[in-house]
Amino acid sequence: MPGSRIALRHGLIDAARQVTTLGLNKGTAGNLSVRAGDGLLITPSGLQAADLRPNDIVFIDSEGEWRGPRKPSSEWRFHHDILAERPDVGAVVHTHAPFSTVLACLGRPIPAFHYMVAMAGGNDIRIGAYATFGTAELSRHALAAMEGRKACLLAHHGMIATGRTLKAAIKLAVEVEELAEQYWRCLQIAEPEILPADEMERVLEKFKTYGDNAQLPSPPA
């Protein structure tokens, strides 16, 4: 099979199922990719994670071309473009996680209400402007929101999280969703106080060596 790399295919399937188990995606929503040589492997369009088999995973080359029995996820463009533009990124996770999506639909970026926002690479988690799913325009908006960041929200859509590995990208997606829920709950009472920029700079510096051996959270019982 073109672009085989069977271990990466199995790893991507396991990751897609884990994202569903963690409640970050439901049904056929969301998609994941991992860097593979001169291209990427990505989950296909229209299949639930539980039904995925290695041959369903799609290889896309550096030119954005693919072949095989399955079409890639409709969001393959921003996966391809993020991996092409960001050598620090080895995997991309896109979810429609509930609280992240609520904030994205409200046009609410996540500010530095909590120091853990720095896990996403800066002093906020931005929102990429809305564009129709699967378009080059959406990819451009995602890249802009991801500049200097490891994660972002997508207006009226969902969330993107990245990492050097699938494990790291999923861990960050879990963290972003947790922050989104905490921020939403704060907003039910009042606007939370925002940490100053100099404090977030200190946190960002400390995070350069934080969590290297952190374990992925277990799924809820």
From Swiss-Prot:
Its annotated pathway reads: Amino-acid biosynthesis; L-methionine biosynthesis via salvage pathway
The cofactor note reads:
Binds 1 cobalt ion per subunit. Can also use Ni(2+).
Q: Could you give a GO molecular-function term held by this entry?
A: aldehyde-lyase activity
SUPFAM superfamilies, per database record:
AraD/HMP-PK domain-like
Q: Which UniProt keywords apply?
A: Amino-acid biosynthesis, Cobalt, Lyase, Metal-binding, Methionine biosynthesis
Q: What task does this protein carry out?
A: Uses 5-methylthioribulose-1-phosphate to yield 2-(methylthio)acetaldehyde and dihydroxyacetone phosphate. Can also use 5-deoxyribulose 1-phosphate to yield acetaldehyde and dihydroxyacetone phosphate. Part of a bifunctional DHAP-shunt salvage pathway for SAM by-products.
Give coiled-coil spans as residue ranges.
none
Q: What species is this protein from?
A: Rhodospirillum rubrum (strain ATCC 11170 / ATH 1.1.1 / DSM 467 / LMG 4362 / NCIMB 8255 / S1)
Protein name listed in UniProt: 5-methylthioribulose-1-phosphate/5-deoxyribulose-1-phosphate aldolase
Residues annotated for Co(2+) binding in this entry: E75, H94, H96, H157
Q: Which gene encodes it?
A: ald2
What PANTHER family does the database record attribute to this sequence?
A: 3-OXO-TETRONATE 4-PHOSPHATE DECARBOXYLASE-RELATED (PTHR22789:SF0), FUCULOSE PHOSPHATE ALDOLASE (PTHR22789)
Biological process (GO) annotations held by this record are: L-methionine salvage from methylthioadenosine; pentose catabolic process
Q: Pfam families this protein is in?
A: Aldolase_II
EC annotation from Swiss-Prot or TrEMBL: 4.1.2.62
**Cofactor(s) the protein requires to work:** Co(2+)
A GO CC term?
A: cytosol
Q: Which family does it belong to?
A: Belongs to the aldolase class II family.
Q: What happens when the gene is disrupted?
A: Mutants produce only low levels of ethylene when grown on MTA. Deletion mutant accumulates both S-methyl-5'-thioadenosine and 5'-deoxyadenosine extracellularly.
